């Protein structure tokens, strides 16, 4: 129904003030919902930035070098603990970035690997 009122009010010259009021009300209605959405987005980005700063410092604490540009790292991903064995590379800015080569183990898989270390060592010695 509001669309028909707009058409009628725009066609008649006597209701110009009514159409201006309608336009102002519509503008206010449109502006009001947008403001909270923008505030939420900026809050989310600031939270993301602060969490990324925290994760980068904790990532350094949980990285153990096992070779040239190869590391074992312990991290939290979507609420799950993962043990990564991964190669890293240096980007042009000098930052270390994770490479494609690597594997992520959950704690159960990590325990199974640790239990089989002696068997793996024996197999390496035989070769």
Swiss-Prot record:
Residues 31-44 have a biased composition (Basic and acidic residues). The modification N6-acetyllysine is found at residues 35, 53, 68. It is found in: Nucleus. Keywords: Acetylation, Activator, DNA-binding, Isopeptide bond, Nucleus, Phosphoprotein, Transcription, Transcription regulation, Ubl conjugation. Changing residue 101 to G: Loss of ssDNA binding. There is a cross-link at residue 68 (Glycyl lysine isopeptide (Lys-Gly) (interchain with G-Cter in SUMO2)). Residues 77-101 are annotated as: Interaction with ssDNA. Activity is controlled by protein kinases that target the regulatory region. Phosphorylation inactivates both ds DNA-binding and cofactor function, but does not affect binding to ssDNA. Seems to be phosphorylated in vivo by CK2 in at least 7 sites in the N-terminal Ser-rich region. GO terms for cellular component: extracellular exosome; nucleolus; nucleoplasm; nucleus; transcription regulator complex. Pfam families: PC4 (PF02229). The record marks 50-51 as: Cleavage. GO terms for molecular function: identical protein binding; RNA binding; RNA polymerase II cis-regulatory region sequence-specific DNA binding; single-stranded DNA binding; transcription coactivator activity. The modification Phosphoserine is found at residues 4, 9-11, 13, 15, 17, 19, 55-58, 118. It comes from the Eukaryota. Residues 7-16, 46-57 have a biased composition (Low complexity). Residues 2-50 are annotated as: Regulatory. InterPro entries: PC4_C, ssDNA-bd_transcriptional_reg, Sub1/Tcp4-like. Residues 1-64 are annotated as: Disordered. Changing residue 75 to G: Reduced ssDNA binding. GO terms for biological process: negative regulation of DNA metabolic process; positive regulation of transcription initiation by RNA polymerase II; regulation of transcription by RNA polymerase II; RNA polymerase II promoter clearance. There is a cross-link at residue 68 (Glycyl lysine isopeptide (Lys-Gly) (interchain with G-Cter in SUMO1)). General coactivator that functions cooperatively with TAFs and mediates functional interactions between upstream activators and the general transcriptional machinery. May be involved in stabilizing the multiprotein transcription complex. Binds single-stranded DNA. Also binds, in vitro, non-specifically to double-stranded DNA (ds DNA). Homodimer. Interacts with CSTF2. Belongs to the transcriptional coactivator PC4 family. This is Activated RNA polymerase II transcriptional coactivator p15. It comes from Homo sapiens. The lineage of its organism: Eukaryota, Metazoa, Chordata, Craniata, Vertebrata.
């Amino acid at each position: 129904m509001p669309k028909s009122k707009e058409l009628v009010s725009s066609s008649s010259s006597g209701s110009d003030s009514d159409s201006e009021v309608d336009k102002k009300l519509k503008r206010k209605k449109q502006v009001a919902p947008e403001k909270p959405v923008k505030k939420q987005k900026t809050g989310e980005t600031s939270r993301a930035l602060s969490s990324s700063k925290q994760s980068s410092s904790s990532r350094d604490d949980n990285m153990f070098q096992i070779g040239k540009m190869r590391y074992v790292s312990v991290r939290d991903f979507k609420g799950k603990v993962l043990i990564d064995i991964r190669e890293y590379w240096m980007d042009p800015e000098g930052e270390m970035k994770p490479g494609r080569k690597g594997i992520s183990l959950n704690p159960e898989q990590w325990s199974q690997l640790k239990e089989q270390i002696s068997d793996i060592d024996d197999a390496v010695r035989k070769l």
